[in-house]
């Protein structure tokens, strides 16, 4: 049975949500359905899962922007790691935003896995003071 992966976006008034979702295609008589057991992930930032999730959600403040995209060089989905602006605002998604670190979601052994704190920034001893941060992301995207 074929399973596809969808990167989706749902805007909201106080927080936006980006999804990584599995789509299973049924036979001709069945319709496709969203959500699939293709994730071998027990946590994503502050979200903890009792069971393997059918989809992964990235929720963050609607005035900010967060990256969730496929990168050919790293062979996976690279996403901004999201964290609350203050420790007391854990799980209040309107207070979440990128914290300048990255996570990588990659395909291994028939499931999507996650590697938190994935090192994208290369060869830096001191952080640059301008916007020219050298990362290993594909510059064409």
Regions inferred by a protein language model and the residue ranges of each:
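Short catalytic/ligand-binding loop motif for oxyanion handling, primarily in non-cytosolic enzymes
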Residues: 14-15, 87-88, 122-123
């Amino acid at each position: 049975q074929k399973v596809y992966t969808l990167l989706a976006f749902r805007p909201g008034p106080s927080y936006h949500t980006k999804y990584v979702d599995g789509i299973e295609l049924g036979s001709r008589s069945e319709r496709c359905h969203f959500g699939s057991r293709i994730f071998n992930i027990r946590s994503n930032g502050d979200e903890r899962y009792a069971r393997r999730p059918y989809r992964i959600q990235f929720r963050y403040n609607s005035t900010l922007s967060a990256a969730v995209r496929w990168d050919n060089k790293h062979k996976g989905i690279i996403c901004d790691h999201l964290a609350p602006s203050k420790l007391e605002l854990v799980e209040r998604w309107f207070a979440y935003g990128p914290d300048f670190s990255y996570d990588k979601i990659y395909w291994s052994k028939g499931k999507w896995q996650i590697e938190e704190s994935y090192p994208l920034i290369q060869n830096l001893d001191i952080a640059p003071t301008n916007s020219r941060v050298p990362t290993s992301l594909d510059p064409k995207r």
